[in-house]
């Protein structure tokens, strides 16, 4: 298969190495303390997540839920009560980070959200979406609701929009 070589074969003249597909990395800052940012991000994701167009159920999607424990589900709920799983929490370390499988791609990828205190009332929220090397070129173009998928930057733009929505929601809950 193009881009692959047999196990133990060393790269040499004429060999083809697999393309490296870099992770998507986005970050933002929130004017609030670490605990508030993490808790509000997780517990109100169903309020601020941009379900249109970033959901499995489209117009049927009503909310998003994160089960707050290792092994917990991240899922959306539709207007008829049906749930569609986005992934499972592989790491749960409040208030610093969580890592989840991402099942909304043809082959699972992984998303890490990290929360870092930059000061008493300033927190950085960073996302790294990785594992793109598991997808074919066609899957990379067709893997998300936005036209072009990974290959055209749709996921990068989607994560930027999600982070911006989270900042607005979190900062609106400040006293």
For each predicted feature, which ranges?
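Hydrophobic ligand-binding cavity/cleft-lining segments
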Residues: 2-61
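Intrinsic-disorder/low-complexity, polar/charged segments enriched in Ser/Thr/Lys/Arg/Asp/Glu/Gln
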Residues: 23-29, 73, 84, 97, ...
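Short beta-edge strand/loop motif at the mouth of beta-sheet-based domains
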Residues: 43-86, 95
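Beta-strand/loop substructures that line and gate deep hydrophobic ligand-binding cavities in soluble
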Residues: 103-157
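A short, structured loop/turn motif at beta-sheet edges
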Residues: 31-35, 90-95, 114-124
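Short, highly charged C-terminal tails/helix-capping segments
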Residues: 58, 62, 164-175
